[in-house]
Amino acid sequence: MGNYYSCGASSTSSPTSPSLVDYYYCYHRYPSSCSSTSTATSSGGRMPIRSHQQRLSSPTAVLGHETPALREVYTVGRKLGQGQFGTTYLCTQVSTGAEYACKSIAKRKLLSPEDVEDVRREIQIMHHLAGHGSVVTIQGAYEDNLYVHIVMELCEGGELFDRIVERGYFSERKAAEITRVIVGVVEACHSLGVMHRDLKPENFLLKESSSSSSLKAIDFGLSVFFKPGQVFSDVVGSPYYVAPEVLCKHYGPEADVWTAGVIVYILLSGVPPFWAETQQGIFDAVLRGSLDFDSDPWPTISDSAKDLIRRMLRSPPRERLTAHQVLCHPWVCDDGVAPDRPLAPAVLSRLKQFSAMNRLKKMALRVIARNLSEEELAGLKEMFKAMDTDASGAITFDELKEGLRRYGSNLREAEIRDLMDAADVDKSGTIDYDEFIAATVHLNKLEREEHLLAAFAYFDRDGSGYITVDELEHACRDHNMADVGIDDIIREVDQDNDGRIDYGEFVAMMKKGAIDIIGNGRLTIGRPTTATSDDPSPTISSSSR
């Protein structure tokens, strides 16, 4: 829903959206490549506005569940920005004093059910991408009778776009570092079944004002979940950055790579590759796809950089580099930071992380996952449904193997079998929904204090403050884990050797690192997280920003 600070409007269905113009020239000039059909969900008929607004007056109309009042959790401070849908404020968490940005969206501005769905999906996608070091972190969402409030990480360093304007263009070294961040976000989105659809320099903010500050991707208001092979037709995005297949209403995630290629061109030259005095003139230039590498500063730019841009801006999309291939391009990885092997999808890294956990931790994660909100789980729910091809409610080995292949994995069969065994906590031979969610949801959701307290209380049935052998045996029976060595679990977690597990020992077990994915997509093993951190995800090092 618009910019991080401005709360601008960008509904995929709004008839007044500036992106939805007459693309007659596309059909006249490119009839073989343009299509008006789509597998994307149709908006269908609209309900009367008055009836729609009456429904929105409920404090659960958008999120679908009750939330605490925003001002019970945060104090709201100065205004940071304002746009068509609402206002962004500085807010301070009452319990910790930590500062965040709060985007308050006026429900009266949501004129259709499609607008409501856009807000709901934006929140779901932000939760789904949580933990990536270059994606702004959502802290929570709140709803009352008048507003939906999205509380997120505060980024005070300004827009990447402003940095481009200030400098005209970046050095190639700096541009390559920024490219790694931007395309790393694209790769992470695609591996999690998300298409961004509105990448642009304005949607990347600097965390702080320092020159070495990290970049954070914001604004997922136009982003959508996609399945491999799915085709979309709604024309969205920003004129300078939109891919030709989007104008032709027949596109997939490859469009994000085109958009990233446009950003790389701007980083190196200070001007967009497709420019005209009018919006339709811009679209015409996009469809022609002619690149200017003759004007300044291009004669001084390396051939490697120009090769990358050409390959990112190829049409048709099937000839374009994937996000992973961009990260492996020599211009991007000249300093050795870019990955030297295919990136496993982020979900795959989480499965590997899960496989290193003991059985008590796996049970605890299942307990926590069951209590996560719908918007936190929506993305993983879609991935589960995509893998569960026979809709049986459980993923078989063959379904897991095929699903991982479609999401970009090239694991050997033995490795997939290991992941299957790790996720199949009850040893039924399949992965049910609870097991899938527990194995793939990012740990920053699972390590929050309220979740840990609830999970500990689940095991500590008598409220004594300790998990005993009897209570652990009871929990194992509930989870169909009859073969678990109770004594071994107690011995592993019980740090003071009193034969039981207190809350501190339980938290230490839950926060102990196993395998994590770092900003450039590579896996590190045995990397512990600190007990005081709310977000166990690592940050991108200065060499990879």
UniProtKB/Swiss-Prot annotation:
Reactions listed under catalytic activity: L-seryl-[protein] + ATP = O-phospho-L-seryl-[protein] + ADP + H(+); L-threonyl-[protein] + ATP = O-phospho-L-threonyl-[protein] + ADP + H(+)
Keyword RNA-binding applies: no
Lipidation (N-myristoyl glycine): G2
Pfam families cross-referenced by the UniProt entry: EF-hand_7, Pkinase
Catalytic residues of the enzyme: D198 (proton acceptor)
Signal sequence segment: none
Coiled coil: none
Molecular functions (GO terms): ATP binding; calcium ion binding; calcium-dependent protein serine/threonine kinase activity; calcium/calmodulin-dependent protein kinase activity; calmodulin binding; protein serine kinase activity
Sequence ranges assigned to domain EF-hand in this UniProt record: 375-410, 411-446, 447-482, 486-516
Membrane topology: Lipid-anchor
Activity control summary: Activated by calcium. Autophosphorylation may play an important role in the regulation of the kinase activity.
Subcellular location: Membrane
Keywords: ATP-binding, Calcium, Kinase, Lipoprotein, Membrane, Metal-binding, Myristate, Nucleotide-binding, Repeat, Serine/threonine-protein kinase, Transferase
EC number: 2.7.11.1
Binding-site list for Ca(2+) 4: D494, D496, D498, R500, E505
Residues reported to bind ATP: L80, G81, Q82, G83, Q84, F85, G86, T87, T88, K103
One GO term describing the cellular component: nucleus
Region ranges (Autoinhibitory domain): 338-368
Record-annotated Protein kinase domain positions: 74-332
GO biological process entries: intracellular signal transduction
Annotated binding of Ca(2+) 1, by residue: D388, D390, S392, E399
Primary localisation category: membrane
Protein task: May play a role in signal transduction pathways that involve calcium as a second messenger.
Recorded domain comment: There are 3 contiguous domains conserved in the CDPK subfamily: a kinase domain, an autoinhibitory (junction) domain and a calmodulin-like domain. The autoinhibitory domain (338-368) inactivates kinase activity under calcium-free conditions.
Family note: Belongs to the protein kinase superfamily. Ser/Thr protein kinase family. CDPK subfamily.
Descriptive protein name: Calcium-dependent protein kinase 6
Organism, scientific name: Oryza sativa subsp. japonica (Rice)
